[in-house]
C-alpha cells in the first residue's frame, strides 16, 4: 500500500472587504494588483499576512492602512472563508473574510502593491473581481450588510 501525504492547509492572513456607505447603499473598494505583485492585473480585496502575535483585527487595521491609507471605523468577522489552492506554495490557503467599514468621504492612497482602485456597488463589484469565491463573498457581505449592525457580536476590536 502506498503511503500518502496531505496537501498542506495554511491560514497565513486575511482577506478584507473595505466598504463605505454612499447614497443609502454600500460600495466595495476593489484594488487592482500591480504588475510586480503576484496575481498582477487582477481585482480584489485588501489582503495581508499576520505578523508576529498580531490579532486578526490588528492585521486588518495595518493592512487596510498600508494598502489604502484608510482607517476602519468598524471591523467585523463574516461567516465566510476565502479558500483556494496556491500553486506557488503548493498549499491550500484558507483566509477569514473580514469587513472593514470606512467613512463615506474616505480618500484612498494606494501602496505600491496596487496600481488602481475603484468603489463599486455589489453588482458591478461582482463583475470586476477575478475570482468566483470573491463573487460569492460579495453576495454574502451584501446580505450581512442588511442586518449589520444589529448583529454586533461579530464586531472585532483591534
Say what each PLM segment does.
Residues 2-29:
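Conserved N-terminal beta-strand and adjoining loop/helix that marks the start
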Residues 9-11, 23, 38, 90-93, ...:
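A generic fold-level signal
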Residues 25-66:
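Conserved Nudix-box catalytic region and its N-terminal flanking loop in Nudix hydrolases
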Residues 44, 92, 119:
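Short aromatic/basic micro-patch
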Residues 65, 69-106:
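Active-site segment of metal-dependent pyrophosphate-handling enzymes
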Residues 108-140:
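NUDIX/MutT-family hydrolases
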Residues 130, 134-158:
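Charged phosphate-binding loop/patch that engages nucleotide di/tri-phosphates or the phosphate backbone
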Amino acid at each position: 500500500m502506498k503511503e500518502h501525504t496531505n496537501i498542506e492547509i495554511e491560514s497565513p492572513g486575511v482577506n478584507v472587504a473595505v466598504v463605505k456607505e454612499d447614497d443609502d447603499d454600500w460600495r466595495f473598494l476593489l484594488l487592482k494588483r500591480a504588475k510586480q505583485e503576484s496575481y498582477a492585473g487582477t481585482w480584489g480585496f485588501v489582503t495581508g499576512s499576520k505578523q508576529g502575535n498580531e490579532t486578526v483585527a490588528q492585521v486588518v487595521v495595518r493592512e487596510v492602512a498600508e494598502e489604502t491609507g484608510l482607517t476602519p471605523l468598524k471591523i467585523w468577522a463574516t461567516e465566510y472563508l476565502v479558500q483556494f489552492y496556491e500553486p506557488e506554495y503548493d498549499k491550500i490557503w484558507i483566509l477569514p473574510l473580514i469587513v472593514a467599514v470606512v467613512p463615506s468621504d474616505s480618500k484612498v492612497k494606494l501602496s505600491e502593491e496596487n496600481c488602481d482602485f475603484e468603489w463599486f456597488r455589489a453588482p458591478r463589484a461582482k463583475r470586476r473581481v477575478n475570482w468566483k469565491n470573491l463573487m460569492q463573498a460579495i453576495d454574502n457581505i451584501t446580505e450581512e450588510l442588511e442586518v449589520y449592525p444589529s448583529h454586533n457580536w461579530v464586531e472585532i476590536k483591534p
